Amino acid sequence: MDLGIPEFTCDVSLEDGKKPQPLQFSFTLYDLDGHGKITKDDIAGIVSTIYESIGKSVVVPHYGSKTINVRLTVSPDGKTKQTASAVKKAAITPRRRYRPRKLISDDDGSDTSENCPRVMRTRANTVVANTTINNNVKHKDNNVAKDEDVVDGLTKSSEAVETTFHNNLNGKGKTLNVKNDNIYESINNLKCCNIQAAQASKPTVALSQSPGTLNNSTATTVICRDCSLEGCTIDETLPLGTVVIPATTPAAAISSRAKRKVVRKSRSSRKASKLTDDFSRPRARSLSVGNENCYENMIGTTQEECWKSSLCRRELIEIIRDSMVKNSLCFQPNRKPLENSPKHRHRSHTIAARIGAEHCGETVMATQQALVAAHETNLCGYDSYLHQTICAAANANHAALHLNGGVVGNGGVFTALPLTTSTPNRLLQHHSHHAHAKAKRKEHRLAVATRSQVHHQVAQPVKLSTAVLNQQYPNLSAEQKLSRSINQVEKWLDNRSPKLVNKLKLAEEIAEKSPRVAAAKLKRSKSKEEITHKSTKFENVLTTDLLLDNLKITEDIAELSVVTPKKIFNKECLISSATKKNIRTHHTTKTVSTTTAVVPPAVDKASKNLIQLQYASVPINAELSECENLIRISDAEEELHQSVQQQQGTHQQQQQPQSSVSSPTHHHHHHAGASLLGENSGSSASAASTTAVHRYVHEHIHHHYHHFENDPDES
């Protein structure tokens, strides 16, 4: 039984929590199609009209929204009983990022905001004449099914209702006098509802909601068919304005949908019920590590829980810094050595036994101690990473100063440390390293020039060249030679220097006793025996020691003149150590027999010493690695060599004219150099050659070496 009602009057009351006077709206709906139903287009027109009137003053938070709850009371004109009703309900959506929202611009229900989430589902029930509620059950069921279909296609643009900020709107009927008008308070009451237990004979009445119940709630007024009026009977003479939704007999078809809606709305209401009215503040972009949805404008328990689950950036930095300090961790970039990693010394940066007058140890140490003290005050700030990166080398220098300070106090060796701190900039380290090496070379040149002007024998600084180190450790491999510790070298210097001083004093006494003759200019000598006068065994030993010391000076100059790369040098060391035994096997009496003494008889011991000093001050452009085979001998082998020379002195003088006549001059030079190479490589060391021999070997080294290996017995 359909009732043809052409007009409906809808009165809407909007209440704002901050405004005492509610907004009153009155709508008249016309049933133009003759179906007697309120459609979604009608509801959309009502909602859009309400929003256009209040929407301009609403500030919408970007993460959520409020819901307008509008209750429509529709009654025919002149009727005193409730004849028709319509309920519009709006649900809150989950939180989303801010999107600009499109509004409904027309009243005919056209959907113009497709990008907005669907917020409100409106269900319009059948307008029936409700004089007898249980009449026409079949007709009502059909209408309810149609209305459910209408709900699914309801306008998405009703999100405009969401955007009312503080306006939790409660529809008030003009004549609401119901006993239990606060039965339906919030969405939380629906948790106890058992929708599946709906009974067809038990209708449900949605009553008016008090103004304060939804003031801070985003829950919508969802109609519960089962528990809203339990124990209450329906008054047949309900006053006009009461919303009545008749129950349906086949409730199982609707219960599943309603249950899903209830769960969805209750979940959103729990989240939104914790929000306060302070939504007008803009969101501060959080730098926390924790929850992405942690907003600064959330206060109370919600904000406390959110901040408990996240870490502020400042707190995170503090935790990381404390952990690094506790574990002594520091980020080391690639190819950068650690503090306690073994440091390899450069070959050319060796240690002198005595500190010259140019060095001022106390000044250097005082400057470095002041530098270390400045770093110990942690001038680089609170950051532990910067402190460990910049100030680590200063602490290492401080420890090295304590070590070297004790050695200097005992008269030992002092190594001048560079005054630059270790910074992450490798260019600074590289520059300071080479500047320090250049200054050291310049000081050494000045010292050599000063020694060359002095005509009496003085104690020379002992150069720790590779030959001297090989003399102490002849069986070490090339890698072991690279990692010799400085302590072993200093210990060797302390044991070595007193012996040399005693020998030099004896040499000075012998030189003073012998008659002084004007120094004659010698020819270019080819061997050590042309300078050494074989008078007694004691003099030969002293002269050999002097040659050893002067040869070390020559090595200093050779190192300053030619800088040998480390890889080439190691290769040459390996070659020389590998071929040393073969050269020794070839070195027998024939090698010694080719060398002669052609010293003019007028030259005495003092003049020979003077000439040696002059030769020693001349720079030699020869690679140290090539001449290393000439300077490898021990003191015991040297004394044995001198005794062999005395025994075969007469035999050498007899064989020399024959060899010189039988061979051309250039060929004789080759054999003399080759025999000398074999002698000083197999049985010699850092003590067996003069500066002239270095010159000669530099000119013919490769030819002599291969010639000697091919025909070692040729004389």
Swiss-Prot record:
Residues 256-282, 639-690 are annotated as: Disordered. Residues 642-664, 673-690 have a biased composition (Low complexity). Keywords: Cell membrane, Cytoplasm, Developmental protein, Membrane, Metal-binding, Nucleus, Wnt signaling pathway. GO terms for cellular component: cytoplasm; nucleus; plasma membrane. It is found in: Cell membrane; Cytoplasm; Nucleus. One of its GO terms (biological process) is negative regulation of canonical Wnt signaling pathway. PROSITE patterns: EF_HAND_2. The keyword Metal-binding applies. The keyword Repressor does not apply. InterPro entries: EF-hand-dom_pair, EF_hand_dom, Nkd-like. Residues 18-53 form the EF-hand domain. Cell autonomous antagonist of the canonical Wnt signaling pathway. May activate a second Wnt signaling pathway that controls planar cell polarity. Required for neuroblast specification. This is Protein naked cuticle homolog. It comes from Aedes aegypti.
